[in-house]
Structures are given as C-alpha cells and as structure tokens.
C-alpha cells in the first residue's frame, strides 16, 4: 500500500477542515485540537499516534504565534487508518 502523503486525501481534508475551524474562531483552539484528536489518527511508518497527542507537535504548530493559522509540520509519511 502506498502511504505517501500525495495519496493521503483523507488527512488533507481533515487538516483543511481544522485549519478553517481555527481561522474562523481562533479563540477556540482547544475545540480544533479535540476535533483533530478524533479525526486524525494515523498509522505512521514508525508508530501509531494522534496528530496533536505529542507535546512537541502541538508546539510545532505554534497556534498563538501564527495569526494566519497553524503551520504545517513535517512529519513521517503517514496514512489515515
């Protein structure tokens, strides 16, 4: 199975939705985090993880420092379970 990001439309769709949620209501970042925890469980080449579970990943997004929305963080090639 090809797990490259270019074929990972489900993850892209979830990420875009969460970005839109963040942009529309930046004061509700925790809601976006909750949505992402439920929608972005991925099977990574190294381990299973939820996108926002790892503290370093939350810090990588730097919500408060990026007014136009969350930055994309480069992670291992993964695919939606």
From Swiss-Prot:
Main location, first listed in the record: host cell
GO annotation, cellular component aspect: host cell cytoplasm
Basic and acidic residues bias spans: 14-28
Coiled-coil boundaries: none
Keywords (A to Z) from UniProt: Early protein, Host cytoplasm, Host-virus interaction
Entry superkingdom: Viruses
Region span, Disordered: 1-28
Induction note: Expressed in the early phase of the viral replicative cycle.
Subcellular location as annotated: Host cytoplasm
Subunit: Interacts with host IL1B.
Function: May subvert the host innate immune response by interacting with host IL1B and interfering with its function.
Family: Belongs to the asfivirus L83L family.
Protein name listed in UniProt: Protein L83L
């Amino acid at each position: 199975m090809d797990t490259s990001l270019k074929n990972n439309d489900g993850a892209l769709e979830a990420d875009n939705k969460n970005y839109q949620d963040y942009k529309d209501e930046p004061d509700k970042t925790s809601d976006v985090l909750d949505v992402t925890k439920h929608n972005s469980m991925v099977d990574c080449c190294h381990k299973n993880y939820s996108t926002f579970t790892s503290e370093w990943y939350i810090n990588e997004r730097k919500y408060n420092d990026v007014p136009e929305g969350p930055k994309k963080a480069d992670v291992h090639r993964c695919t939606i379970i």
